[in-house]
Amino acid sequence: MDIAWIEWINVLFRFTHVLAAIMWIGNSLLFTWMELNLVVPRTDDAKGQPRDPDLMGTLDMLHGGGVFHLEKRVMHAHAIPERLHWFKWQSYTTWITGLVLLGALFWSNGTTLLDATRTALSPATAVLCSLAGLLGGWLVYDGIWRSPLGRKPILAATASLLALFTAAHFYGQIFNGRALFLQIGAMMGTFMSANVFVHIMGNQHKFMRSLRQGRPYDSRYGKAAKSRSLHNHYMTFPVLFLMLSAHFPRLYAADWNVPILAIVVIALMAIKHLMNSRYHFKYWLWWIFGTVAVSAHLIGILLHLPPPAALAQGAMPPDPAVLSGKTLFQTQACATCHMQGSSQIGPSLYGIYGTTQELADGSRALVDDAYIKTSLLDPASQVVKGFAPAMPSFAGKLDDGQVADLIAYIRSLTPQIPRAQAAP
């Protein structure tokens, strides 16, 4: 696909994706908040009148200089409102635009998914693995909650998370960090949208069809829809984080990115639960602070651990210069554009040292220490052909020692290149 079309698709569909997601997640948060704050009517009202048996709860909300008085009621066939609002297209639009973005940015060029330092999979196989995760992940998740295990929410939720993190471990062996986080986010987003289509809308259609056929109110359909709606509610925070994960290269480019992903997902679900508990749990806010502190501490430990392979093999600690350069590579957001595999933003630095690159002005340059240093301090003069001149200059931002450390790290990404090729 022509790069210009990909960029236009990126702009249009990314904005639509974000806009629809805001509307969808906003609905999820609001409806659950209203459910939690409904005031269940007493046996008799203040005037001594018997309680309305069809009234499930009331809620008064102050906004815009007035009060919204909300009632949740049992609906009967003779009292179906003429104008009834359904909430589904926010979900469908989010999922469809997300799928288009995955196709344009990752599936159209499967190498953007892969970590070439870990796998020799073909781009086509990588795309198939990604697609299989969306469909297979939904089938596993839905199967868990349809099974007898689904009647035990804590066990079913644990099984669902274990299945999700198993998938993350698998993709962590073949995908680069950015693609890994977005893949798991896309899988969770698929669970949510499929919940809307299959269970929430499906049961609501059954409910309305039953009423229009004159049958009495049946609470089973509403309970089934509400259960999956609550699933979606708890997935909102993790999906938002993973949706924005391209902005967190320090995390997705880490050696221990799969455990970091797991900690983030669990912590954000726990925080959502604590927020829901605020009306009956006195210390909910302190527990949120504690969850954030513990999660940040665990992630901090993982960020400073040697790579898993080094720990498993008992390897010697890495060169301090390489380790410092790697930290700079992550904290300076280099990994955002120069990730493993190929990128549409900047060239991958994995295996680039010692190669000859064609520049935008038609000249050719050997990628050695001198080239990397010039690229860092004066990137406009070293733009590789096919990429936009978007790299910022680090002149005045990095001292000579930091530049040397970054060069050492980039050199280490091509270990087969002899040290003698380094510029003096």
Where do the protein language model's features map onto the residues?
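Polytopic transmembrane helical bundles with strong interfacial aromatic enrichment
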Residues: 1-312
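Electrostatic cytochrome c docking/interface patches
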Residues: 6, 219, 308-330, 365-366, ...
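Generic structural signal for secondary-structure transition and capping sites
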Residues: 233, 334, 380-384, 415-418
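Extracellular/periplasmic ectodomains of large secreted or surface enzymes and adhesion receptors
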Residues: 297-323, 406-411
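Stable alpha-helical elements in mature extracytoplasmic
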Residues: 321-324, 368, 372, 402-406
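Gly/Gly-Pro-rich "capping" loops immediately C-terminal to redox-active cysteine motifs
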Residues: 326-327, 336-378, 392-397
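C-terminal capping alpha-helices of c-type cytochrome domains
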Residues: 392-423
